[in-house]
């Protein structure tokens, strides 16, 4: 596993350090930040969004707080005013609203700077931004669009739908409101092969919104609020649920990420990926 950082808007130099548990990774990352000029995007007095994923309550799979604390210290040393931020989830979970999101952040150890839910109490704070590609526009979370600079901290991992999730997905899904998330997910469709469906209702039981309907021992997904997440598809015991136009999700992620980037002036975003 590696940690790397890059500065700039879309594609500039990328710097790597080895993920070696026998080394002091804070000292190693210090040298990386200097080489990459990670914090050169910050000017004195800037309100700096520190975009991260605080993890689910009780789940340890997130960037550890001591790495984030180090980044917060570097931002303050550069004259910035950092705030931790992430957008509320579309699905019903512990991070579905700002109150529970903040509680989760605190319980998981993210208390070194104020935490602001990027899209407001119930995802009502957003801005429509023009973009390019498969999406003509995207709903960007208000606190992201209003920040002066941003450090994007991403935990890179595999993903059922997009294949891989890193900085682009962190921008695209993590910096957009619920409406923006739905815009991206709805570029794909779900299809149920009725010859394989047994009506077992596993899809309904695992769906965060309990959306699939079981009619005459067959499942149907017709709700307009279905966000085309991969949960039901991955849990179906007979593999009856399939995605159509699955390649569109990566195109939508790229469009949304570009829309987020364009709310900032040039060279006001840096990225640190784990």
Which sequence ranges carry the predicted segments?
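Extended, low-polarity segments enriched in aliphatic/aromatic residues
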Residues: 13-44, 49-52, 57-59, 63-66, ...
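Short, Lys/Arg-enriched N-terminal segments with co-localized hydrophobic residues
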Residues: 2-11
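Short secondary-structure subsegments characteristic of cysteine-rich extracellular domains
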Residues: 66-74
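Low-complexity, intrinsically disordered short segments enriched for Gly/Pro and polybasic residues
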Residues: 1-2, 210
